[in-house]
């Protein structure tokens, strides 16, 4: 509905999160032949390092908002991401590939929903995030890294997030576990993977997901050393906060059915007069 879209424009909309991912950019130098001459060209290519293990915990606190007769579910949540990145890796360097500064990135569909400045704990070091995902102007946050940061792959990130209607998270870990609970009694579990277990009661819900790269094919979706960044069609864990049928919807349906029955009655009389040549009413 237009009212819901208006509320999303003035606050924050549906949220989809992709991350955390370590991105190692390289300057790729190559030679190109054009019109009988050879020119030196450069492009940026990317290597993606995905978590070995990723554990996500979230608590969704939903507050219904209303605009006119329309309602939308606005939520706030603190998402905790813990896990580890592989540490046994070598940054490639040659005449054709020159490494740039690596960074850890999080992509969000609506960065307006970030309520506080998050920090990355990588090993024993705290690193502040900067605005922007640093990936082709996509919304999100990123934290620059160096060789000392990458020596310890254990990480922890806490993200305070606001959104509306739904929350989707891409399981980027080799092994991903996700627990989400909330105070909304009507969750709708959609996305590419259903919860392995869930409960829904009047005072809220709880759900658990678990998957691996064997099911998500996530490693293939992040092709390394390519100028294109990644496959946009990533699988997600997704929960939608649906609104049960309310009195306004019942009244709207009743009015539409009333118009339908009245219209069908007049059409029936009209067809009877046309086909039979008889007047139903003497006037």
Q: Model-found features: residue ranges?
A:
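Soluble non-transmembrane domains of integral membrane proteins
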Residues: 2, 9, 23, 35-235
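Short extracytoplasmic
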Residues: 4-33
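Generic secondary-structure transition motif, activating predominantly at the C-termini of alpha-helices
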Residues: 8-11, 213, 243-245, 258, ...
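Core alpha-helical transmembrane segments of integral membrane proteins
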Residues: 246-283
């Amino acid at each position: 509905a237009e009212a819901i879209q208006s509320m999303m424009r003035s606050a924050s909309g549906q949220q989809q999160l992709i991350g955390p991912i370590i991105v190692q950019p390289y300057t790729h130098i190559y030679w190109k032949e054009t019109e009988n001459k050879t020119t030196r060209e450069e492009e940026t290519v990317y290597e993606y390092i995905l978590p070995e293990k990723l554990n996500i915990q979230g608590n969704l606190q939903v507050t219904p908002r209303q605009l006119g007769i329309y309602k939308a579910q606005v939520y706030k949540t603190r998402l905790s991401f813990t896990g580890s990145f592989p540490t046994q890796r070598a940054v490639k360097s040659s005449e054709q590939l020159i490494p740039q500064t690596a960074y850890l990135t999080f992509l969000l569909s609506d960065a307006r929903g970030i309520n506080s400045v998050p920090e990355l704990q990588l090993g024993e070091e705290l690193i502040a995030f900067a605005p922007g995902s640093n990936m082709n102007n996509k919304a999100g946050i990123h934290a620059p890294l160096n060789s000392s940061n990458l020596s310890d792959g254990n990480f922890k990130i806490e993200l305070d997030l606001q959104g509306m209607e739904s929350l989707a998270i891409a399981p980027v870990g080799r092994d991903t576990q996700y627990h989400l609970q909330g105070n909304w009694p009507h969750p709708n579990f959609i996305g590419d993977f259903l919860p392995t277990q869930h409960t829904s009661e009047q005072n809220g819900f709880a759900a658990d997901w678990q998957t691996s790269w064997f099911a998500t094919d996530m490693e293939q979706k992040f092709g390394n050393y390519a100028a294109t960044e990644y496959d946009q069609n990533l699988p997600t864990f997704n929960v939608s906060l649906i609104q049960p049928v309310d009195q306004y919807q019942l009244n709207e349906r009743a009015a539409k059915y009333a118009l339908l029955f009245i219209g069908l009655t007049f059409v029936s009389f009209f067809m009877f007069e046309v086909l039979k040549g008889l007047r139903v009413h003497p006037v």
